[in-house]
């Protein structure tokens, strides 16, 4: 199980691992699961000709595939019903799934070589997440993923967007790193940080022709609260970004509201 802050690359790393193993792979987003039993076991249907019949889920097919790699994404957002169903599947001493919706409640054994990889966000910052059952946690080896430092972040952004100005990419990496360090400090200046996912989004906007401040307005500022006015988290981050902005007019964007003269120049 890979745990860590949102946007630090857990799912990307898990998918890269799956691809690198060159084995059959299956992806299940448990955070988007409304009906755990239907997703993991299957559904009972009615047909006017066939009558009532049971349809196995894609998960049943996955665990029945030899040497399959199964990615259970957003495990911390899964309904407890999903955890209960997964208990026997993930237990090394059991490794089976009972299809209690099917006639006779047959047992499906997990095929030889099947590997499970899970991702989870753990912490009070994430809404709609649950404290993962200890019994589920014990069924995984946990890898705690940390955020990248500024040099690593810059290397990633440069790799993904080699044609973007290096100074701008370094600025994005340093801004992200600064917010991470401050949010860890506990002094109350920032309650959250710029994730790697957000950094990549900002780099993409730079590639599309936005300047740094414009990209930050879209990809960074909305994550920080505006409560408190001049003392707000958003103002703090805007001032941080401003240190890296070359456009002197961007200073005016920190606090200045559009004037009537400005509004007259806007073409709708």
Give the ranges of each region predicted by the language model.
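AAA+ P-loop NTPase catalytic core and its hallmark functional loops
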Residues: 1-170
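Alpha-helical lid/collar subdomain of P-loop NTPases
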Residues: 149-268
């Amino acid at each position: 199980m890979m745990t860590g802050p949102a946007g630090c690359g857990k799912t990307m790393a898990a998918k890269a691992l799956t691809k690198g193993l060159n084995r059959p792979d299956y992806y299940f987003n448990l955070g988007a699961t409304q009906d755990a039993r239907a997703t993991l076991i299957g559904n009972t249907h009615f047909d006017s000709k066939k009558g009532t019949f049971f349809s196995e889920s894609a998960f049943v097919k996955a665990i029945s595939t030899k040497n399959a790699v199964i990615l259970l994404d957003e495990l911390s957002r899964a309904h407890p019903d999903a955890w209960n169903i997964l208990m026997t599947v993930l237990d090394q001493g059991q490794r089976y799934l009972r299809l209690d919706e099917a006639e006779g409640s047959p047992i499906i054994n997990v095929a030889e070589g099947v590997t499970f990889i899970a991702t989870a966000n753990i912490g009070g910052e994430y809404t709609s997440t649950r404290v993962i059952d200890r019994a589920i946690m014990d069924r995984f080896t946990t890898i705690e993923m940390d955020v990248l430092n500024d040099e690593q972040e810059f290397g990633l952004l440069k790799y993904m967007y080699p044609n973007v100005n290096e100074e701008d990419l370094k600025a994005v990496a340093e801004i992200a790193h600064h917010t991470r360090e401050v949010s860890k400090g506990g002094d109350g200046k920032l309650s959250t940080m710029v994730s790697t996912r957000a950094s990549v989004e900002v780099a993409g906007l730079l590639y599309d022709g936005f300047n740094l401040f414009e990209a930050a307005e879209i990809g960074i500022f909305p994550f920080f609260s505006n409560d408190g006015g001049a003392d707000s988290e958003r103002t703090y981050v805007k001032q941080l970004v401003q240190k890296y902005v070359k456009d002197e007019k961007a200073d005016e964007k920190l606090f200045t509201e559009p004037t009537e003269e400005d509004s007259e120049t806007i073409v709708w």
